[in-house]
């Protein structure tokens, strides 16, 4: 998703395509990648994170889609409010938390990840990781001036509706409270 995000290309198309495919195809391939990997522990660490993301998407998205239909709140807003709820529970300030702090865009890490995706190089994966960090830094906006500039830029680019929910709102959206409680129970 994050590789040169403003342009459709073969690398970011993989993420979109994978959301439409059956997971067993990827997981069978992943098992082979891990067997053949020179760095099995790093490959397993990546796939464990992938499995967590997959499980969260698989279990929560059906609820999120229903919530969107009922409330009109966007997918990214619901996810952002769910992130807020979990961060607040851990006594972490959601306005300043950088979700990408755990990403280390080394060529070594990128090479491990690239093994899972046919036709994608370690350099492309490293760029993707760097874009993820950049987007996180850009969208983490405690400063009201930065927020106004961000939202203005989104509107000018015609991306406001789809992207504004990725910026943590200053205050919780009360309309999301019950949805977050439902997701927390999933």
How would you label these PLM feature ranges?
Residues 1-186:
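N-terminal leader/auxiliary helical segments
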């Amino acid at each position: 998703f994050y590789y040169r995000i403003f342009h459709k290309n073969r690398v970011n198309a993989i993420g979109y395509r994978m959301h439409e495919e059956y997971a067993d195809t990827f997981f069978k391939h992943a098992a082979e990648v891990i067997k053949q990997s020179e760095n099995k522990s790093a490959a397993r660490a990546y796939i464990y994170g992938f499995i967590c993301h997959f499980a969260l998407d698989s279990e929560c998205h059906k609820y999120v889609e229903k919530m969107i239909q009922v409330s009109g709140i966007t997918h990214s807003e619901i996810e952002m409010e769910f992130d807020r709820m979990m961060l607040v529970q851990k006594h972490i300030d959601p306005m300043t938390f950088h979700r990408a702090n755990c990403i280390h865009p080394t060529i070594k890490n990128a090479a491990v990840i690239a093994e899972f995706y046919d036709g994608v190089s370690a350099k492309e994966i490293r760029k993707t990781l760097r874009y993820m960090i950049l987007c996180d830094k850009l969208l983490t906006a405690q400063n009201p001036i930065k927020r106004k500039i961000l939202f203005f830029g989104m509107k000018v680019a015609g991306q406001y509706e789809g992207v504004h929910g990725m910026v943590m709102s200053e205050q919780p959206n009360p309309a999301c409270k019950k949805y977050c409680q439902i997701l927390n129970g999933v």
